[in-house]
UniProtKB/Swiss-Prot annotation:
Classification via PANTHER family: GMP SYNTHASE [GLUTAMINE-HYDROLYZING], GMP SYNTHASE-RELATED
Keywords: ATP-binding, Glutamine amidotransferase, GMP biosynthesis, Ligase, Nucleotide-binding, Purine biosynthesis
Species of the source: Rhodopseudomonas palustris (strain BisB18)
Boundaries of every Glutamine amidotransferase type-1 domain copy: 24-217
InterPro entries xref list: Class_I_gatase-like, GATASE, GMP_synth_C, GMP_synth_GATase, GMP_synthase, GMPS_ATP_PPase_dom, NAD/GMP_synthase, Rossmann-like_a/b/a_fold
Official protein name in the record: GMP synthase [glutamine-hydrolyzing]
EC number: 6.3.5.2
List of residues binding ATP: 245-251
GO annotation, cellular component aspect: cytosol
Pathway membership, UniProt: Purine metabolism; GMP biosynthesis; GMP from XMP (L-Gln route): step 1/1
NCBIfam families in the record: guaA_Cterm, guaA_Nterm, PRK00074.1
GMPS ATP-PPase domain mapped to chain residues: 218-410
């Protein structure tokens, strides 16, 4: 995605259509790489949460009026002269506060405690011992018990602020959890939001439900109703165009917008010839025949494959595909005529990634949407009905809207499509081999009942041929690589541990059923050091 344009709400502006209707928690971001996980854990409790950089938090707090605040972790040291701080207006607002890692340290220091640089740094799995009871531990941890947590810190609290007591300790931090029951301030040196702290979600649940007293009334049904109202208010009698990619995000956005404004929406589906087997037909059938949404289907395969001929560099592939997509989409949009708005399936992580925790431009802005840049070129305003949602929430909304499970639950698919699953030069022959191999592999996974247990699975056509023997003859054909990973957010991933019998059966089917392949390998690289996709 490009940085949000002037037609889009600021990434740190509280979302207006949820601000008045539900209990909310504000998450003050100090730069942790896992701050998004805090928001997800809170939302799992049915409570709406938003992330804002620490230097935007005071204004966001005043506008959002949250019922509680969470201070995130971060890479800085509170001992630095220019260390980020939580706004004093938030600390004195009378709302419950939970500090995590750096959030604990700055909370303690700002309230009069002492934080020192640790001689014993803690990174990774650690064990804490509960020394006293507190509301966070209710029904989860008991006094005297020892529990696994995930630490990532150098500094530590050595003297408590007035009103606080220490309720847990660890080898590298004798005060690992602190509590001020009167003010409902709690903080911990470890990270409860990550899966490596087994009971972390339960601790966050206790803060949300028992400490803050929030009932959790934010549901996808409520979001759907409020989003429809917002779309109608924004669009009025105007026309909207939406680019469909074949993925879940744009599909859910299109169905939601169509429910709000009907045939004021026209979808444009550019088939660049790099989709999975029968994917173009699936998209057309779903939107044109099942939902009766006005749809322009553009078969641009020859154009894209012609421009990609001889291109082997993966970044040049991406740029070529992006440029062509924009050109084709823009041409179709002009032919439709009269559109005032451009719809995009922007998600909340896209919004967060466009602004760093200091409030300035982020070092890396991910280009998630092929239509980035079109609003300015075509003088259209953006409609982004999913910009407050995470990927898993979009799937829930899709089910709420009645999209078929086979569509909603499908694995992520990259914008450049099969182009980045075919390292080296792309040809129509290679794409056909790859499509067929991928279809057999996914079919085998579904038949084994494993599809929903895997974050993403796909086949890759390697740019090499190997010698083989089939029947009584020698073959010299392509190698197919199989990839399957487990993940919660795609930021990190582990390879899926198939049984050898499964891999053997999948390889046999691919070699027997897909012409042009005589060897199959399985990729057991995790992320990091590798990436999920090969290019």
């Amino acid at each position: 995605m490009t940085a949000p344009s002037k037609t889009s709400a600021s990434p740190v502006d509280p979302s207006p259509h949820v601000a008045a209707a539900h209990d909310k928690i504000l998450i003050v971001d100090f730069g942790s790489q896992v701050t998004q996980l805090i928001a997800r854990r809170v939302r799992e409790e049915g409570v709406y949460s938003e992330i804002v950089p620490f230097n935007k938090a005071e204004a966001a707090f005043a506008a959002m009026k949250p019922k509680a605040v969470i201070l995130s972790g971060g890479p800085a040291s509170v001992l630095d002269d220019d260390a980020p701080q939580a706004p004093l207006s938030i600390l004195t607002a009378g709302v419950p506060i939970l500090g995590i890692c750096y959030g604990e340290q700055t909370l303690a220091k700002q309230l009069g405690g002492i934080v020192e640089g640790g001689h014993h740094r803690e990174f990774g799995r650690a064990q804490i011992e509960i020394t006293d009871d507190c509301a966070l531990f209710d029904g989860v941890w008991e006094k005297g018990g020892k529990y696994d947590v995930w630490m990532s810190h150098g500094d530590r609290v050595t003297q408590l602020p007035e009103g606080f007591r220490g309720v847990a300790k660890a080898a590298g931090s004798p005060i690992s959890v602190i509590a001020d029951d009167a003010r409902k301030f709690y903080a911990m040196q470890f990270h409860p939001e990550v899966v490596h702290t087994p009971d972390g979600a339960k601790l966050i649940r206790n803060f949300v439900r028992k400490v803050a007293g929030l009932k959790g009334d934010w549901t996808m049904r409520a979001f759907r109703e409020e989003a429809i109202e917002k779309i109608r208010a924004q669009v009025g009698s105007g026309k909207v165009i939406c680019g469909l990619s074949g993925g879940v995000d744009s599909a859910v956005a299109a169905v939601l917008i169509h429910e709000a404004i009907g045939d004021q929406l026209t979808c444009v589906f550019v088939d660049h010839g790099l989709l999975r087997k029968d994917e173009g037909k699936t998209v057309v059938d779903l939107f044109r025949h099942h939902y009766n949404i006005p749809l322009v289907h553009v078969d641009a395969a020859k154009l894209f494959l012609g421009e990609l001929e001889g291109v082997s560099d993966p970044e040049l592939k991406r740029k070529t595909i992006g440029r062509l997509f924009i050109n084709v989409f823009e041409g179709e949009a002009k032919m439709i005529g009269g559109a005032d708005f451009l719809a995009q399936g922007t998600l909340y992580p896209d919004v967060i990634e466009s602004v760093s925790f200091t409030g300035g431009p982020s070092v890396t802005i991910k280009s998630h949407h092929n239509v980035g840049g079109l609003p300015e070129r075509m003088n259209m305003q953006l409609v982004e009905p999913l910009r407050e949602l995470f990927k898993d929430e979009v799937r829930v909304l899709g089910r709420e809207l009645g999209l078929p499970e086979v569509f909603v639950g499908r694995h992520p698919f990259p914008g450049p499509g099969l182009a980045i699953r075919c390292p080296g030069e792309i040809t129509a022959e290679k794409l056909e081999i790859l499509r067929n191999a991928d279809a057999v592999y996914i079919d085998q996974i579904r038949k084994a009942g494993l599809y929903d247990k895997i974050w993403q699975a796909f086949a890759v056509l390697l740019p090499v041929k190997t010698v083989g023997v089939m029947g009584d003859g020698r073959t010299y054909e392509y190698v197919v690589g199989l990839r399957a990973v487990t993940s919660t957010d795609g930021m990190t991933a582990d390879f899926y541990g198939f049984e050898m019998s499964f891999l053997g059966a999948a390889a046999t089917r691919i070699i027997n059923e897909v012409k042009g392949v005589n060897r199959v390998v399985y990729d057991i690289t995790s992320k990091p050091p590798g990436t999920i996709e090969w290019e």
